[in-house]
Amino acid sequence: MAGKSSKSEWSAKKPYFTKITDNFVLNGESSRKETRHIVFDLGDSGLEYKAGDALGVVPRCPPEEVEEILRICGFSGEEIVETNLGDCPLRDALTDRYEIHRVSKKWIKGLAERSGGDAPKSEIRIVSRKRSSTVDGSLIVDWSSSGEGDVPEGYVEMGEIGDNSAILLHELISDNDAMEDYIWSRDYVDALGDFASFGFTPQQLLEGMDRLKPRLYSIASSPDFEEGTVHLTVAIVRYSHHERDRTGLCTGFMADRCETNTTEVGVYMSPTRSFVLPEDGTKDIIMVGPGTGIAPFRAFLQQREINGDSGRNWLFFGDWTEEGEYLYRDEMGDWKDRGIISKHDLAWSRQGSEKVYVQHLMEKNGEEIWNWIDGGAYFYVCGDKQYMAKDVHSTLIGICSEFGGMSPEDAKDFVETGLMKTEKRYLRDVCLLYTSPSPRDLSTSRMPSSA
């Protein structure tokens, strides 16, 4: 049984509420990363999936942040507000209906529209100056302004000053780079600290906020492995910025605020139409999945073993270090010992004097990779779209050129037209990964732009 995806009554708008039954850290004790294995019970939902699908998870906003927003604004939280899902108390709207972890441009622009868009300015002018002697009280300086631009001797004209909040707002509206930097690194607690002086009604507070969106995570299990469950491999986003500790909205929700077998979490299936195993189980597959990109390949390997497929399985995996970030080490070792994994190449970027990435190992194995592809193998990539997937893509083209006897142009056409579009043997599950405002704290998951 290969598992299947089917239409379900459960969706992003109507998720199935279930519980997490297992939630543990996969990293070694020395790791600075926090990658968790999370298992959801599907109960009597009727939800079905196949290896390669994704699970949608509906997060809830942190209650402490909700309460801080209410405190700053002076609201009780019981005020009734209008939302796209109907009327509800403001506290409920901030918890379950809006994204409060990152400020939206629309919200900032709404402030500008309400305030008229211009930074109010004030002018301070010295109109007189008197100075008396500390000895006998006699008047030493007696100066009065004679008109605009007149300043006493020894003074420098400073120009105009304005309300700090209004000046900041004017800068954000007029400078797109400043706007991007501001919204990337701040949530609504930060923003209200800057703009609370503008004043809000409960309804105005919500105007321009983004609606709360589910996050998609590549499923890390075959439906036939532990029936009635679905597994995820999730990198927890944690960082400090503007003197506050923060987490990704959904990853922090699952890691910190979901009590095992107790907290209800909304989920639904997001089927893939292309990132699937070959129908012919005798076909070889090559899988490239560093970091949490390993998730769908754990599902693939489980499914191939359960099906008894005879095709060979070649897995490229990588991360920072073997000791800290070798995810599912025991499972991978067991599969390798039993021949389920035919070849297993590991790349560690922070172990030793040289940074080694998966594309470097592909280059070293270029001739064999070409032989597999030339023999009908499928090639899969999962993970970071911006860097890793691009490097793997260009490396694959180089391999096909060098060992397939093609010009660089012909190799590019072979990969991008032949393998990807015509034969559909080159399949990718890639996305822009979330990074915290500090580039040193990069964490990964399959999710839209924010965690």
Predicted regions and their residues:
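Single conserved hydrophobic/aromatic residue that forms the stacking wall/gate
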Residues: 434-451
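FNR-like FAD-binding dehydrogenase module
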Residues: 1-436
